[in-house]
Amino acid sequence: GYQFHSETDSEVVVHMMDYYYKKEKNLQKALERVITRIEGSYALCIVSTIEPDKVFIAKKDSPLVIGKTADASVAASDIPAILDYTKDVYFLEDYEIAILNKGNVSFFDQYGNPIEKEITTIPYDNEAAQKGGYDTFMLKEIHEQPYAIAETLRGRVEGTDRIILPELDAIHDKFKTFNKAYFVACGTAYHACLSGANILERLTGIPTFTQVASEFRYCDPIVDEKTMCVFVSQSGETADTMAALRLAKEKGCTTIAVANVLGSSISREADHTIYTCAGPEIAVASTKAYTTQLIVLLLLGMYISQALGNENEDYKRIIEGIASLPQHIENILKDEKTFEHYASYLKDLKDTYYIGRSLDYATVLEGALKLKEVSYVHADAYIAGELKHGPIALIEQGSLVIAVATQPNIAAKTISNIQETIARGANVILFTIDGQEVGNVKETYILPDVDPILQSVLVAVPLQLIAYYAAGLKGCDVDKPRNLAKSVTVE
């Protein structure tokens, strides 16, 4: 038997390697035996005094990337960790084995047969993963959004009447066969899905559903070969989203991934992948990845609408508005001091409430999540029309309500709900459009004049800055909030 000296499950692997090495007298053969026995997710880098010049590597579900230079080989769980050494990388698939030594990498399948792997060249360097003069990564990434959105749009919008997504050209005619669509993700990406699903259904008439990835596998989704499933993940490694993707593929769905990290697991397993072009996002709280996800999901909805022959004047107006988004966000960022002032309302509060309707509801969910993540202020987001069904009992003198009303067809309804909170003593910060101002609110910010379907992208930026400055007032580490990780690679 073996005596254990720690409480980590990884020690099991060490003892199993020892056990099988004694049988096989070969470290690679021992590792092949080990990976057929262990269960769960793992990324293994094994070194031994028996062959000290080699590193033996294997993975299942967990991310692992390998880099190679002329005189060195490196491995890490994420691309930025190795960009100081090389931009040429390999992505290991589940149950594959890599053996690293100086300047050389060999790859094998789980049975020991040699295999060839293609090199992927990463299109950015590690300078993009530095603070670049900003105090924090989060603030830097908020300010990078105009550029990130422009890069995400580059080559995908032609003139004023055409969306180009060559990643989906192979299924251009297949969109006519889908009778439903699912959008699946976790956290911030799920909020992007709520907007994307709303837009797709609005533009195409395809019945569209959203589901949190951790629930998708267990709700027995009624999906089949006539279902399109869209999976969104910044890292492309989110374990719950990966598991949901695999279930959808088992059921015959057409799967589309939206990811930011080139060569990530989700992007490799999905039938088709559309990349956001946000560049590396280091802060745990997502900002530029979120707004570029919104952009890609908007482009997806418009591309499918185009494939179905649904172009009209509204369609052309939206395309014209898309091109203006980077400049509008530049202008919003010039009002940063205004949003820092809005954050001062949160200094001594333990609770705040966000309200909106339709697309604005998805936006306030994300705004509330940002505040919770980085400032640890309890924040709840509600559909404005649901206030009277319970949540309004929480509103009292001095409560803070952050309201978003950017959809002209329902803004009057939201404004009525805002007045209800004011009557009960709430202080209201309102983000709205010209002509929808409300009396007696504490603060009003008028957003640029764009098509309502685009407002989610714009209003996200002030909400991010409010969360950022509220965290600063409370002395919180915005880049590394407590109990959170950038990429959640366990279920």
Question: Which residues make up each language-model segment?
Answer:
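Conserved short alpha-helical segments that host acidic/polar catalytic motifs at enzyme active sites
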Residues: 1-135, 144-179, 218, 330-333, ...
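A residue-level signal for conserved active-site and pocket-lining positions in enzyme catalytic cores
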Residues: 13, 44, 61, 98, ...
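Active-site phosphate/pyrophosphate-binding segments
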Residues: 36, 145-149, 153-182, 262, ...
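Short, glycine-/Ser/Thr-/acidic-enriched flexible segments
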Residues: 49-52, 62-64, 69-73, 79-82, ...
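Conserved phosphate/anionic-ligand binding catalytic regions in large, soluble enzymes, centered on
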Residues: 57-66, 134-138, 149, 183, ...
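Generic C-terminus detector
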Residues: 112, 440, 450-491
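Glycine-rich phosphate-binding loops that contact phosphosugars or nucleotide phosphates
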Residues: 176-310, 315-324, 404-447, 466, ...
